[in-house]
Amino acid sequence: MLNSLKGLLSRKNDVPSPTVISLGQVWVDIMMDIDAIPQPGGFAVANHTMPSVGGSFRVMQAASRIGAATKHAGVIGNGPWASLIRKALNDNGIEHIGQDRIDADSGFRLVLNDSERKTFVATYGAESQGNENTFDCVEPGEGDVVHISANTLMDHSASGIDAFLHRTASDPTTRDYSIVLNPTNTLHMVSDHLLEDLVLVQPIWSCNR
């Protein structure tokens, strides 16, 4: 993913200040190191617990670190997890241009790590509560890079992605900005209609799995 961004930004040197705009979701990961996953009804003690901001934040952090102006267009909530996310964005020079929800906190994931594999338990929050107007604030300029993660394609925010594509990117031959799609391992859960629309706009596929 980072190599894709570096390549795109380096090819846009003739365009002033290209911006990376992420339409992905951001949540908090709570990593818990355990000796073994407990059986149903069992008990386990975490040796180490560390909360960190995850989701599309890592892509934006990488873009910011290589010197690109970086913006987050996803939804952020109101609460302790959202506060952690906002601080991480501010600390890394990432501007939040998306919607704010005051009636829900951002979500989090419990990540149980037994040294052999990771087990995930997700609680979805404000980041997943978008609609067809979620990304109306996004107006990519010439040379910009728009990042889309598959997580945003599987819930209410998916309608916002589809609306954004139809509004700004329907003809890839005339589009003056780039789209990078990170499908992760959940693309099979995306609706056929939205997947077809994504294929038609001819994004750059970042296949890192």
Regions found by a protein language model. Give the residues of each.
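Glycine-centered flexibility motif
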Residues: 41, 77, 107, 125-126
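Glycine-rich phosphate/adenosyl-contacting loop at the front of the ribokinase-like
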Residues: 2-75, 80-87, 143
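Ribokinase/PfkB-type carbohydrate-kinase core domain
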Residues: 1-26, 86-101, 114-209
